[in-house]
Amino acid sequence: MFKHQAVLTGIACALAFATAAAHAADKPLKSIGITVGSLGNPYFVTIARGAEARAKQINPGAKVTAVSADYDLNKQFTQIDNFISAHVDMILLNAADPKAIEPAVKKAQAAGITVIAVDVAAAGANATVQTNNVKAGELACDFLAKKLGGKGNVIIENGPQVSAVVDRVNGCKTVLAKNPGIKLLSADQDGKGSREGGMNAMQGYLTRFPKLDGVFTINDPQAVGSDLAAKQLSRTGIVITSVDGAPDIETALKGNTLVQASSSQDPWAMAQQAVNVGYGIMNGQKPANPMILIEPALITRDNVKSYKGWSAPH
């Protein structure tokens, strides 16, 4: 049930297409540059590994270089410049700022490089492969609202303002707005997409709000950090939901934590699809739709044992 069946069927077709194209293509895939938000996040590590695995299926000698932008736009500009200087064939881009990154995207394309946005949109990219993040936010917050019986004090622990985070928050807000008994206390604190950031943001919330019933965090590292903060302050009875389906959240859902659900992503499949699409574009095969969405699935304490996870190849 967690195989993202419809999407994976499409990916299987794309794999077959790309493999066939590899035999006839007049432009080989020799190198890929990958720049992501943070290689301290296992999610982005999985993206890098998935992309490398697919690239080496196409060409065993392909060189794949992955770097961490740390959500720093200027740093990412420099990384893209370095990829251009290295004459990579393709860049997989997890943009620090989806709009401001456009000049770097255009510069890479002018150098003959195909740019595929991964996980978040990037202005000017040849194509984008990402989770349906609006749906991910909706799933997590629908669970949260139902768990609270449609009433209570809730916060949205925000994060870096990339398109994926904005979409998740918008999806969550849409669901919460349908529950008049739920009071949204705050949605503007940046948990920085990390465990430490989530813990710091949650400590502030717990100090500020003596009664807190539910928390939606924009990713799993923030959820784990928020749970740690609640433990440190001996706060119980809070429902935490998030997005990712990371290994740490599997552990949290099986243990004694406040985390109750996470909308899963599939970074391995996302990365493989991104390489497929980019390789096709390199050889004149543009996708029918440049925005490719992978549907999320909700993991809870009730079904986590059957969840296959995304840390292993598939």
Regions found by a protein language model. Give the residues of each.
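Helix-enriched interaction subdomains in cytosolic or periplasmic regions
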Residues: 2-8
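A residue-level marker of the well-folded mature domains of exported/periplasmic proteins
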Residues: 3, 13, 19-314
